[in-house]
Every structure is written in C-alpha cells, then in structure tokens.
C-alpha cells in the first residue's frame, strides 16, 4: 500500500525502456523513432532513469557517461545556456562523436592518436573550432571531457594498448576536483590498470597556474598515478611563456601556427629550436601538429622534433577506421614494452 498516495521511487516503464535501449546500444534516433517520442523526451527519461539507478546501485555508476562528475553547487544544470544544453544533449544522443588523428615518430611509425570531437548538428558536421569556443560552463566542459575519456579507455582496451590515446583537458577542467575522480574511474575501466600510460592528457597552454593553483597540484598528482601529461599549443598566436619551473610535462606540442610560420619567420624558428633543446635536456618529447606536407615533416625532423601530427601523416578518421589506420602506420616496427609520449 502506498504511503500518502506517493508513487514508489523505482523506474517508471518509460524510463526502463529508455535505459534498456541505451544498454543494448540502440542509437537515440532509432529508439526515439521506434517509440514515437522526441529526442528531448528520450534524453529526459534516460537521465532520470540513470539517476535513480546510480542512487540505488552506485557500483554501476562508472559505466554511465559523465556519471563520475559531481554536480557543481554553484552551477546547476539549469544555469547552462541554450547552446550548452543542446551540446550536453548532443553528447548523450551521440550526435557529438569522436575522430582520431595519428601521431607518428620520425620513421612515420604510429605512436599514438589524439581524440578530436565533431558535432553532427542539423545535418552539418561541425569541427571542434566551430563549437568549443562557445562553451563557457564548467559543467558542459566536464561532460565533454568525460565523454572523450570514455572513448580513450574503450580504444585502449579494444586495441590492447598498442598505442596511446590523447585527450584534451581544457583550462576550465584543469583545476577541477572532478578531474582526479574522472581519471581514477578511467583507470578502473582499463582491463589492465598498468596501461594508464597509454592514456595521455593534453593540457591547454592557456591553463593559468597563477590564477588556479589547483591546476599544478592536479598535474603533479596525475603524474604520480602514472598518467602522462602533455602541454598543448606551445607558442600559439596568443601564447604566453608557461611557468615551466612550476610544472614539468612529459611532452610538449608545438602549435600549428608556429609550425606554419617557421619557414618565413626567424623568430618562430628560434622558438622551435629552443623548445627542442629544452626537451632534449629534460628527457621530454617534442611533438609538432599541423604537419601537412613532406617538406614540413623533413624540416622539423632535421631540427630534432621526434613526433608528428597532421595530414602529411594521416587525416582524422572515425572509430570504425582506427584499426585500419593502425595497421597502415605500424609497418615493421618492433613492439615496445612501453609507449613513450
């Protein structure tokens, strides 16, 4: 008998149907069409159902997208802009999807892959630069980061740790307490926890250590746990010298803009040489992105850059083509016990 006419706190039938469809791998579009409901209604049913399941069975939480994120007390979901709500909804309906771009060594042998985001929005596929700048909410950044981390874990498991997968950590997430929890969840989801070195985090160069002292602490704690940390966007157009005495990274990635400028700007070339020399002295890796021609590849290789990313190596591919790209770039390279960033 119900007390005071209240309904039990279990799943409703629509919520159960939504959860079963999610766990069976049905796309949001197919499930919404089959049930004759809108994507928004399906999203609300999934969200409500997942919340109830996690409350009663917290051990199931790591298997759900974004479940390791603690809601920000100062920033409830209702405070998101209309664009950010649409973006979070697109993540759950899989309209935001990953693509993978290879990172190769000087022999053009595969070392890793960076995971990039694309958005199938209203029939057009948006590149990351077309929607990421419009995200201001910390919560929206956390949900997107959790989504990409989950893709990285799945691919490390699927491909037995053959190469590393790099995930971008935006400045808004770099100092957040949730980052450490998310990474611990990711480690637990790896079939072999020692493969955590295959999960590389790219911190944006505009992460402000002076303003957010927590960022440096997060980086240090992540490195102690075995994760490899890379500084992304070195010497970009808006670059300021990162406090390298405060934080030491495992790798440094030259921004595409300075790679493009090096052939006509002696100052840009000098900066590249200085970073390469610093990496050699500190036993760090030096990568270059935006390598879109054989000429750039050869010049950077001659300077001492040891890893390369760009269309001259391979264009980004969808998850269904990752194995094929890995085979194309594996060549006859000898297997290594560890994967250096």
Where are these regions (language model features)?
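Central "turn" residue of the DNA-binding helix-turn-helix
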Residues: 25, 36, 54, 235-238
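EAL-family c-di-GMP phosphodiesterase catalytic domain
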Residues: 42, 75-78, 120-122, 202-210, ...
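Residues within the DNA-recognition helix of helix-turn-helix
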Residues: 45-48
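Active-site core of bacterial EAL-family cyclic-dinucleotide phosphodiesterase domains
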Residues: 72-134, 309, 316-318
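Catalytic core of bacterial c-di-GMP phosphodiesterases, primarily the EAL and HD-GYP domains
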Residues: 110-112, 140-216, 290
